[in-house]
């Protein structure tokens, strides 16, 4: 059995293009998704292509700090 830290952790994915637009106040919000990742298989930051309802297109969503 696993000792100490859990192998699967919950991560938050945030739209990278909305993040850039929010500085200019053009966007209505920032799209975020919650998912899980396996620490052993993906030790680096997770990036997935997901649909952003604020951009109305598929964009790259990157893992953010909690």
UniProtKB/Swiss-Prot annotation:
Keywords noted in UniProt: Chloroplast, Plastid, Ribonucleoprotein, Ribosomal protein
SUPFAM superfamilies documented for this protein: Zn-binding ribosomal proteins (SSF57829)
InterPro entries (UniProt xref): Ribosomal_bL33, Ribosomal_bL33_CS, Ribosomal_bL33_sf, Ribosomal_zn-bd
Keyword hit for Repeat: no
GO MF annotation, one: structural constituent of ribosome
Gene3D superfamilies: Ribosomal protein L33
Subcellular location: Plastid, Chloroplast
Family: Belongs to the bacterial ribosomal protein bL33 family.
Listed name of the protein: Large ribosomal subunit protein bL33c
Organism encoding this protein: Cicer arietinum (Chickpea)
Phylogenetic classification of the source organism: Eukaryota, Viridiplantae, Streptophyta, Embryophyta, Tracheophyta
Gene from which the chain derives: rpl33
